[in-house]
Amino acid sequence: MTVEQICQIGKVKISDENIAIINQYKDYIIPWLSSDEFKTNYAKKEFPPLINPAKLDYEGSNPAHAWVLNLPLPAFYDFLVFGSHAVGLHGAMIGFFALCGVTRKVMALRGGAAANLTAANLANASSQDNYERMFKEIISLNKLKQSGRIKHFYLQLSDLVLDDDTKKLYSLIDASSALHIVRDPISVLKGVAALPHRAELLKVEEDFVPFGMFLHQDPFAHFSKHIFYMNHGLTMNTDKQSGVGKGKEMDFLPDINSAEWWLLNYEQTFHDGIMYQLLAPSLKNIKLKQTTDFIGEKCFESMCELADHFGFERPKQSDRWLFEKRVSDLKHLTPMILYAHENSPLYTEQNSKAPEINKELVENSIKITLTTRFDGTLYILPELDISSLFELADPVFAVLIESQADALKLLKSPELLTKIKIYIKDLSHALLKQAKIENTKKLKENDVLAWFEKYPKMRQVMSFIMKQHLLLLRTHKPEIIEGYKYYQEFLKLSKDDEPLDLSSGLNGKSISVTNF
């Protein structure tokens, strides 16, 4: 069997690098491809493994080689979660899982998304990049799980990774134990079109550090300038310049016209049907829930149901009040870091001189984080929880110190601790105040329906996209679609519309359709 024949069986792209990898494992590949086990159980797979995955030592494996050899991602995660953006996967569910001992997740990231808060990670994330990163993260988290440091973790697929290797990536993901969360599509558009964003990075000299506050900055005035909304679309406001403010890509108020951008951005929204088809070969048992199952009093019982189904800890009765909270209210305001330097004046001190924000100030500051009880770090590193030292505006808040070294520095600086206590108290009140302000800016589903009434072409686009997005529900759970109050209103609005003509494009923009 030649290398070219092996590549043909595994659909491996011919390149010098891939050929070298195949040659390195050729003595294992040939007998495996000739075995009865391969012919019976694997030969019909679209991307069959080129060596026996059952005999693989994942911890000692090279992720780049594993990708070329079509080896499944290590299935050490407890379960898989998939769904669109704005169904709760990036806010509420992270917190609710953390309260049940599921404190970490691994995520696939669309092209252009950042794995970490560093400028170096702002490059495109291809299918192979995602595979290799997730491979490493799963191995790392499994070691923490085996050591007892964490109890459970999951794999989240809420970004759709689109490139030439999309089918391969998803075929190598085990989705045999899966949770799928769905929501009324009109509510999804309402959510993403009025989604507040907060600055994530702060430029200090030539470097970037996580965004945070300093003792001399008024918490009631400063960070409100760093909360903004995405306001760009393909047919409306296409000439906006990058930046924040009226007439730019970002603004301090949401714009219903951004619904168009989200509607057409199926890497993040409305890709449930595509994801369902991509994962279908390994999907065996889908636990289907709606966003509304995790709101108010229903949430606690829903999490008990998921705990029993997936085998993680049931929520504690003493935490029931937390499951009735709106996690999204503080999602984009926390965690908030306080850089506390002993020479910095408190913002309330009269006639004090504000220090220069530079590397020295940041590096020598004690880092205190105001977060919420939904932060998984509280349960993984409880020794960093110093909430009991503070008077907070709401019991949902919690306070973390970055390290034991910072804790020792704080114990030796009683004057600084006094300043920090005052600041954190005020900051918690400021965050609650800002959350209320942002809530007044929220759009409503009727705003989305009115927008669709104004733009018939967008109704045609929505109807076209929903054929794909609602595939699973239409096939297996049509009663859920029938229960979508606002989507049913959309159907009434669009009942006389002509089907979308793909050949005509969209206001000068070409339309392409990706099929799997």
PLM regions: where:
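C-terminal non-catalytic accessory extensions
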Residues: E17-N41, E46, A407-F516
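Non-catalytic propeptide/linker segments at domain boundaries
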Residues: T2-P74
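C-terminal or late-domain output modules
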Residues: R110-K151, K167-H180, A199, P210-F214, ...
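PAPS-dependent sulfotransferase catalytic domain
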Residues: N41-Q317, K331-Q350, I366-L370
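The conserved 3'-phosphoadenosine-5'-phosphosulfate
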Residues: L278-T418, I424-D426, L431-Q434, E438-K444
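Short amphipathic alpha-helical segments that mediate assembly, nucleic-acid/protein binding
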Residues: V3, Y131, F220-F223, K246-E249, ...
